[in-house]
Structures are given as C-alpha cells and as structure tokens.
A protein has these predicted regions:
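Surface-exposed, low-hydrophobicity beta-strand/loop segments enriched in small/polar/acidic residues
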Residues: 1-255
Length: 255
C-alpha cells in the first residue's frame, strides 16, 4: 500500500458499517456477450471498479441482467448520479484466443474479448450496501494541493460529505500522474475519490456515489507531514452512498 503516493486502486473492502470485518460475500452477475461471442462489452472492468446494471442490456430479456463499469465523469462530477450496484472483484469466461476454449479466471475483464459462442461471462460483485471501503484521494487537476483532503487540519475537512469518482486526468505536479486505466498486469483499478472536482456546494448531493466516514486506519496513513502540513493522497474509509439497494443520503452541509 503506497500511502501518501499517487497510486489509486479503486475501492478495497475493509469492514461492515454494522460492525465487524467484511464477510467476503459476493454475488454473481454477467457481462454482455452476443450469441456468437464476438460482440462483448467494450469497456475493461478492473478489480475495485464500481459497477452498475448495464442500462442497454437491461432493456432486453436476452441481455439482462448484465453489468457495466460506473460512468465516471471526471470533468463534471455532478453528472455522477447513477446508483451503484457494487464493486467488481473478478470474472470468469471461456476464451477463444488460444483456440482451445480455455476457462479464464481473471481479476479484470479485457474490453471486447471474444468468448465461446453461447457461453456467458460471469462477473463477481460485492453488492452489499453495508460494506466499508478503502479508497485513495486524488484530483483531476494539475495542482498537488488539490489532492489534499483538507487544506487546514484544524478547520477544514470533509468527513460525512459526498463525493464523486475520478479516473485519469491530473498531471503536471502529480508524481506520478494519475493512470488513465487499470493495470492489466495486476487487474487492479485506477479509480480514486475526486476531491477537488466535487465542489462544496455539491458535496451535499444525495445522488453522489461516495460518502466519507473517516481515515483508513493504518500507521502509514499519516494525515500531517513533519512540518505540520496536510499530506496529499490520503486513504479514506467510505461507503457507497447512492446504491441500487439504498437511497442516497444528503452530505453534511459544509460549515
């Protein structure tokens, strides 16, 4: 875990909001593939990515119920209003790439991969709305200070407020820059909590996907540096605020 370093990893399950550890329960869903297996879902989904019900496939009996990666709008975060189904943690499919119809168990779905005709792409999703997750703070801007969860530890922090996801963007003074996609070697997500993109006036919106409830408990996740300044790229504990099984709540109004 790279605390204090710009290394977003999506949503990582930690515990339950009702107390105790995460139970490791997941449910099985599907990723879209046509009958021939040559037209499949065209966006990669990585472990830690938030997912939704596919709004296209859900309208047809043959295609439902399939999932899609959450529609992240880093530039206009108030557009992130779709209820979250859960968090993707891997998939299983029959690949035709080698010509031997191999069963592939993967931490990520490779966009548009071909599968055996008539087979289904299984996706495993943490869909419990009570799960508490670990996520890293970052920013879509080129300003390092914008990657801080607070500008003044004594007077300014954003706990119990609502936030959007971010992916990519950010550069310049961010070292390293935000990755624009998940890691195809490890299968890990590159999604982060978009701190600066979610303006104070929007952090009360019940439709935003994330609610912050505290710092991730780890000795390495240090809020302040040696000079007493707030560090960037902190890890936070969050819940899914706007969930398919639970209506989102308003964030606390900033003082």
């Amino acid at each position: 875990m790279a605390y204090g370093t710009n290394a977003p990893f999506g949503l990582r399950p930690l515990s339950s909001i009702s107390g105790g550890s995460w139970t490791e329960k997941v449910n099985e869903y599907f990723i879209y593939a046509d009958a021939l297996g040559t037209n499949t879902y065209g966006t990669s989904i990585f472990t830690g990515d938030p997912v939704i019900f596919n709004p296209v496939a859900a309208t047809t009996l043959a295609g439902a119920p399939t999932i899609a990666r959450y529609p992240i709008d880093t530039a206009t975060v108030v557009n992130e209003i779709t209820p979250v189904l859960g968090v993707f943690v891997g998939c299983e499919y029959e690949s035709t790439v080698t010509g031997t119809n191999n069963l592939i168990k993967s931490p990520y779905w490779p966009a548009s991969a071909h599968v055996v005709p008539g087979s289904r792409i299984k996706a495993f999703v943490i869909d419990d709305p009570d799960v508490v997750y670990d996520i890293q703070v970052s920013t879509a801007t080129n300003v390092l200070n914008d990657a801080k969860f607070s500008t003044d530890a004594a007077t300014d922090a954003f706990f119990t407020q609502n936030f959007a996801f971010g992916l990519g963007a950010g550069g310049g003074n961010l070292v390293p820059n935000n990755p624009v996609t998940g890691n195809t070697r490890t299968g890990q997500s590159a999604i982060y909590l978009n701190i600066v993109g979610t303006a104070a006036t929007n952090r009360v919106a019940a439709t935003l996907p994330l609610k912050t409830i505290g710092l991730t408990s780890d000795p390495a996740n240090v809020f302040l540096d040696a000079a007493g300044a707030v560090r960037p790229f902190l890890n936070l504990r969050v819940t899914i605020n706007n969930h398919i099984s639970r209506v989102g709540n308003l964030g606390i109004t900033p003082a």
